[in-house]
Design a protein with these regions (language model features):
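A general, composition-driven signal for non-globular sequence regions
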Residues: 2, 13, 35-38, 62-66, ...
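Negatively charged, low-complexity tracts enriched in Asp/Glu with abundant Ser/Thr
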Residues: 1-32
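Extended low-polarity, hydrophobic cluster-rich segments
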Residues: 18-26, 33-37, 81-89
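Amphipathic alpha-helical interaction modules
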Residues: 26-59
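Weak global preference for isoleucine
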Residues: 2, 20, 35-37, 54, ...
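Mixed-charge, Lys/Arg-enriched low-complexity segments
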Residues: 48-102
Length: 102
């Protein structure tokens, strides 16, 4: 499981979201990265879940969608969603060369 060290708000540049709540995580390279699992959305779009990896020195970042989930999938996942989101975070982090400590 990924450990949250701190939470921070980031403005998002694509205009679809006002801000994202990001969790500050530590990786094995000794650098800090903000990882967002659930953005705060302006419009109600419950069928989308996103994961963003942000270098700690950034003040804003363009939101990157890495997966699409339907409302039915969210309902079926229930409490398992946070564990599922952790997997998405790890995959996203690995795709940009960031190794996260478990």
């Amino acid at each position: 499981m990924i450990t949250t060290l701190e939470k921070k708000f980031f403005p998002v540049l694509n205009g679809e979201y006002t801000r994202i709540t990001a969790e500050l995580l530590y990786n094995s390279n000794g650098k800090y990265y903000y990882i967002s699992i659930n953005p705060e959305k302006v419009e109600r779009r419950a069928n989308y879940s996103t994961v963003t990896v942000i270098p700690a020195e950034c003040n804003s970042y363009k939101l990157q969608t890495v997966t699409r989930r339907t409302k039915k999938q969210d309902r079926l996942a229930g409490e398992d969603f946070s564990a599922l989101a952790s997997v998405f975070v790890k995959k996203k982090a690995e795709s940009i060369g960031v190794e996260l400590e478990a």
